[in-house]
Every structure is written in structure tokens, then in C-alpha cells.
Amino acid sequence: MSAFTPASEVLLRHSDDFEQSRILFAGDLQDDLPARLDTAASRAHTQQFHHGQVLSRQMGDNARFSLVATVDDVADCDTLIYYWPKNKPEAQFQLMNLLSLLPVGTDIFVVGENRSGVRSAEQMLADYAPLNKVDSARRCGLYFGRLEKQPVFDADKFWGEYSVDGLTVKTLPGVFSRDGLDVGSQLLLSTLTPHTKGKVLDVGCGAGVLSVAFARHSPKIRLTLCDVSAPAVEASRATLAANYVEGEVFASNVFSEVKGRFDMIISNPPFHDGMQTSLDAAQTLIRGAVRHLNSGGELRIVANAFLPYPDVLDETFGFHEVIAQTGRFKVYRAIMTRQAKKG
């Protein structure tokens, strides 16, 4: 988090207006402007563990990672700066949560890239904080309003559910494949061998569907799941519970909080971080896997066929196999052998 995003650059055009404000930053926080903007006081709330890590190093306890913000997270704030995400239900969850806590009269700024659909903020907040567009630059829009009425927020009403081959999948706004199993994960699942045993790590677990599907035909595996997303962590816990599957689930920036070694690491790694394309997580996953695989253990991932992962796999493991593919996706397999770099 060094260079500012276009949304932050638009905010910086108005930096003089924020010098006396006590600001809560929230939403799709992709840089460290919350720690660097000159304000009377700044807090930040994020549902993304990796962004929380960066901001906590600079803001200490004034930056917090969690699914739901609390009264303590908004304490003494008179201004909200909300970065609009690419996912509208995610924005609604977060904004209804935050506006239910902030006092009437709070200044509300919403900023985001036009392609993210930020203009729909006007309609979403019309009954609570009517917005007007106050700036347009860097293909972004900046909207301002004042909180006139607090919404009633009930996190339980945002839960969703769908079924995959008799399995129940619990979801929340912001979780990958919230409305159904994606094609890439389907392809990866088709390669998993029944009656597998050992310790399995599911990185970027989303709603937990890969793990529960694997556990159904391999009940002796011991599951660990992790994700950067607070909604994903909670959704995975709920999915495991709904299917009577045991496993440990926690927030982690790829391997940052992972301890120990595993017999298998599975993943459908993301290649977007908010609105931005990013291969960092997948490359960190591949390179770091050798520090978390037992000898003979394997990394198995699915990815869009056009993404440049074969070179990283070969560089790290010495070789790789493509064990399934379609026109759009490939499932890669790499084995932990003496050829692998020990990291």
C-alpha cells in the first residue's frame, strides 16, 4: 500500500476539507490513505484481513478487521469516508451496518470508480443520507450527504444459501461465488480423489464449498480453511456446521497465519483485489506452499487458463502437471519433492 488508488486521489483533491474532521474510513480500502491523510482523528474498519494488517501497522488499534463494525469502531467520528466496492450487496451490508452506528448529522462521503457502480450509492442511501455528486475525476465519482436517519441493521438478514449435490452452502455479501458454485471450482472438485486421507489446507476458502465437498467423499481428511475476507471466514464456518463437517477456519493473508505442514493444499486463488487485477495472492500461494507441504504433499489449484502460473510452479517445484482443463480453466498439480525450493 504505497501508491494511492484513483479513488484516494480524488479524495486528496479535497484534503483541506478533512483537516478538522474525525473520520471513519471503511469499504474497499486499497491503500494507506486512512493512515496518511491529515485529519483531526482517523479510524478504519475493513472486512479484508490483508488491508487490516497494513493499516494496523500504521494506525494501531484505530484500524480494525471484522465482519461487523461495532459502536467502538465509530466512536467520536463525525465523518464517514466509504470506498465503494465492486459488489453492491457488500456495499449495502457495510453501509447499513455503519450508518446504524453513526450519529445523525454525520457527514457521509462515498467514493469509487465509475465501473464499480458507485453511482448506485445515491439510490441506496436516499432514505438515510441523500447524496449529491461533488466531484468527478480519474474515472471516479465522489458523493456527499449528511446522515438524516439511522437504518436498522440486522446482519442475519444478509445470509444466503444454496445447494450443491445435496450439500448446503452458506454465503454472505462479498463472498466469492455467492450465488452458486463457479465453473473453476467445479473443475477442481472433479479432480479430487475419494478416500483421501491426511491434512488438507483450503486457501482462499470462500464459502467453504471445496472443503465440504472434499470431506463428503474423503471423511478422514483433517481440514484447515483460511481466507482474507471476514465474510468468507464466517460463511465457511457456517457451511461446515450446516454439513456436520469439522475443520479449523481463520483469517489469513495467504499463509500469514498458517502454522505447520499439510499433505495437500487446494485453492481457487483470486486474481482480483477489489477492482484491481492482482496476481500477488496466487504467486504468494505457489511460492509459499513449499514451506507448508509435507514431503510428497501436493499443491492443487485451478486458475483461468490465460494466467501465467506455469512458470512460477516450475520455478518453485521444479515441474507441474495439468490434470484437467477446459477452454477457460486449468487445474495444476505440483508435488513437494527434493527438486522443490525450500523457500
From Swiss-Prot:
Q: What is the lineage of its organism?
A: Bacteria, Pseudomonadati, Pseudomonadota, Gammaproteobacteria, Enterobacterales
Q: Which UniProt keywords apply?
A: Cytoplasm, Methyltransferase, rRNA processing, S-adenosyl-L-methionine, Transferase
For this chain, the family text in UniProt reads: Belongs to the methyltransferase superfamily. RsmC family.
Q: What is its main location?
A: cytoplasm
Sorted alphabetically, the Gene Ontology cellular component annotations on this record are:
cytoplasm
Q: What is its EC number?
A: 2.1.1.172
The UniProt subunit note reads as follows:
Monomer.
Would you tell me the protein name for this molecule? Ribosomal RNA small subunit methyltransferase C
Write down the superkingdom of origin.
Bacteria
Q: Does the keyword Hydrolase apply?
A: no
Annotated GO molecular function terms are: 16S rRNA (guanine(1207)-N(2))-methyltransferase activity; nucleic acid binding
Listed Pfam families:
MTS (PF05175), MTS_N (PF08468)
Reactions catalysed according to its record: guanosine(1207) in 16S rRNA + S-adenosyl-L-methionine = N(2)-methylguanosine(1207) in 16S rRNA + S-adenosyl-L-homocysteine + H(+)
**What role does it play?**
Specifically methylates the guanine in position 1207 of 16S rRNA in the 30S particle.
Does the record bear Cytoplasm in its keywords?
yes
**Location in or out of the cell:** Cytoplasm
Q: Do you know which HAMAP family this protein is assigned to?
A: 16SrRNA_methyltr_C
